[in-house]
Amino acid sequence: MLRYIYATDLNDHPKLARTMFRDRADQFKFRLGWNVSVDDVGFERDEYDELNPLYVIWEEPDGSHGGSMRFLPTTGRTMVNEHFINILSGPITSPFIWECTRFCLNRGVGRHVAAALMLGGGEVMQNFSVEHFVGVFDARMIRIYRIIGAS
């Protein structure tokens, strides 16, 4: 099931939140080898999780995380403007452009989860009048984005 949850509401879904942040640690720190912090309970979280982002999350039948993405409007703080400004010609700031980061899949899920998350991104665009998403991603993701038609 696809869920749309703001960070302030994650406490209403403790298993989903717990498994999402653990899956993020597994994917970004251990599988991809990114320089991200993992806390004592095994969660990968950063300062952008404190800004009340909108998460699009695939919830498995047992209530656990299958996959997720994090969205923030570029009218506020974003990772791309604060950490990757060197690859831009200037800051991206528009109510019609949102940042999408932390695209994460649980190791055991099927391709339908990635496709559902892309559908969720389309629904975010429709429901919030978003025209574009911006994000910086690992080059290995290009193949996945092409498979699901999002490149």
Where does each model-flagged region fall?
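Short, P/G- and charge-enriched loop/turn segments at secondary-structure junctions
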Residues: 41-46, 86-89
